Amino acid sequence: MIERDGAPTFEDVQELLNRSELTDVALYEHAGRRVDDAVDDEFSLQVLTRVGDTEFEIRCKVTAAGHGGQYLADAGAVFTLQSAAKIEEGTAREFAEKVGVMAVYPYLRAAVSQSAASLGLDRPILPLLRAGGVKLTESMDSAEDA
């Protein structure tokens, strides 16, 4: 951790991981609906980060279709810092890619499966996220607290 503008600032993902704890996983929305079987299988993943002084959140939204259903699941993993600090943008992005998305993804998968089961449909199998396979761009992950 370094001092930047008089505030402790994380610039290393490993140090951020060591000085934070996963304290909550919030499910914001999940929905499913029956559709025509002719609808093509689809999958998309959107990721946002929210950074505060003592906590930050990696929020992921999945949309999927297949097996006669369309699904939406939106959840966020909340990490709490040991003490107030800033997180450099690149460090927050790398943490989201390597840790945050992987923490949230099982909850998204469960929400989609639960929606399919509620509709009496075969559950769609969401793709496997491989280490290093999630790459975020600046426009995809910029939501900060003021």
Swiss-Prot record:
Under the heading InterPro entries, the entry gives: SecB-like_sf
The record's keywords, sorted A to Z, are: Chaperone
What SUPFAM superfamilies does the record tag this protein with?
A: SecB-like
Q: Which family does it belong to?
A: Belongs to the SecB-like family.
Outline what the protein does. Chaperone component of an orphan antitoxin chaperone (AC) system; there is no toxin gene in close genomic proximity. When expressed in E.coli complements the cold-sensitive phenotype of a secB deletion, suggesting it may have a generic chaperone function. Does not however complement the toxin-neutralizing effect of its M.tuberculosis paralog Rv1957 (AC P95257) in E.coli, probably because the antitoxin genes are not from the same family.
Full protein name: SecB-like chaperone SmegB
Q: Which gene encodes it?
A: secBL
